[in-house]
Amino acid sequence: MIFELILISIVTYYFWHWTFWKRRGLPGPWGVPIFGKAGAMLEDSFPPGYTLQKWTKEYGKIYGFTEGMQKVMVISDPDLVQEILVKQYDNFYGRKHNPVQGDPDKDKDIHIVGAQGFRWKRLRTITAPAFSNGSIKKVLTTMEDSTQELMKKLREESENGKAVNMHLFYQEYTFDVISRVAMGQPDSQMFKNPLLKDVKGFFEHNRWQIWMFSGGFPFAVSFLKWLFIKVGKFGAGPFIVVQKSVTDAVMSRIAQREADKKHGVEPGEAADYIDMFLNARAEVEHFGESNDEFHKSSSYNNRQLTTQEIISQCFVFLVAGFDTTAISLSYVTYFLALNPKIQSKLQDEVDKECPNDEITFDQLSKLKYMDNVIKESLRLFPFASFANSRRCMRNTVIGEQIVEAGVDVMIDTWTLHHDKNVWGNDVEEFKPERWDSPLTPQQAYLSFGAGPRVCLGMRFALLEQKGLLSHILKKYTFETNAKTQLPIKLVGRATARPENLFLSLKPRV
């Protein structure tokens, strides 16, 4: 009898959750009991951004679905998007996250992407100086050195019109740059860095089992994380290798600092992100911040990091800084190859503003048309759109819709970026000139997010892309060939990356 009562209680609990949106009168895809539509969000061959677009066409600009035990609302109305990301940030300061990612407030290894409230503010404040114009200027020499290494390889590979998978080359470049800037790698290791294989595996391996089961059975998260990290189940291999590499690098630097201190040697100017974070290191395991009274205007003076937070920060910068910039470069290149007139116009700008072999920060700042080209590429392919998802932290109302605390809100960025009512009838055209118009709806452009949680590394990523593209376009013209996928096929979950990008590089005369 007791077993039957427990079983009935469990079934009732899951059914009550499954019908959450139905009881609130909001349309949306049903999914299956316990897991909801989690499977659709974990599909690798059909990026979730496409899935949300499909559902939005069917259910409208605001609808709901369940993803495991999490209740998810989807928004693509520009006014409501601004309400969530900017105007009501105090009510949506948390990010959507799966239980296996840990508790943003209590877990010791939460990084800036997953943190929220006062903890996020502390991490953001400490990290922000690394992405100021002054700091970025200092790493331009490193970027230039990695660029020259890539150019050598491109010269070898592009002879006689050979098809080159540009996405793989961009991955080599961006990983080389971020390894040197963030982790202190002294010299270029392009095309010979063994860690890159595991970093790629971190993104490419589909760990749907742990995401699915942790979402459907959040009470089992500790056990699932143990299986993942300690036993190596659910494709944990690449994650474990990368995590160990970052941990070893940080702990080695700490040991070196302690040895130097014994000999009276003080730390000099921070040479990389590890140094910068260690300058803020505190001898505590956890600060225990409470977000009960958090508001975006709240003052908070803690400027310290725990050792585990330093490791987590370095980890997220390494993997995120590598993946996103390589994907963006790939899509820009794809659109240039498809639009020869636009590519020619961009080459003219580069030739004019960057006449010498060495390219400076000030010269890159003058490449306004290149800014437009990158923006337009990211408008059409907002590949990291899930970074715009938020968690409702306090009961509130947006428009006429009640949103309860604990509900996740996903911004359907793909629909918003392809909305004729927002961008006009030429919305599907690759048209960089649209960004010259003062009427361009800047507030509807979310490739780097909006509001207080706008992408911290935006300026770094743009400089990295502009520097490399300038060097390539001074020497070559991108062209399609028989191996080019037309249209390009996108795959992936957290980010929508190209399956491949085979192009020819025609030397300029």
UniProtKB/Swiss-Prot annotation:
It holds the Pfam family p450. It is an enzyme of class 1 (oxidoreductase). The keyword Metal-binding applies. Heme binds at C455. Its EC number is 1.14.-.-. Coiled coil: none annotated. GO terms for molecular function: heme binding; iron ion binding; monooxygenase activity; oxidoreductase activity, acting on paired donors, with incorporation or reduction of molecular oxygen. Keywords: Heme, Iron, Metal-binding, Monooxygenase, Oxidoreductase. It comes from the Eukaryota. Cytochromes P450 are a group of heme-thiolate monooxygenases. They oxidize a variety of structurally unrelated compounds, including steroids, fatty acids, and xenobiotics. PANTHER family: CYTOCHROME P450 (PTHR24292), CYTOCHROME P450 FAMILY-RELATED (PTHR24292:SF102). Belongs to the cytochrome P450 family. This is Putative cytochrome P450 CYP13A8. It comes from Caenorhabditis elegans. The gene is cyp-13A8.
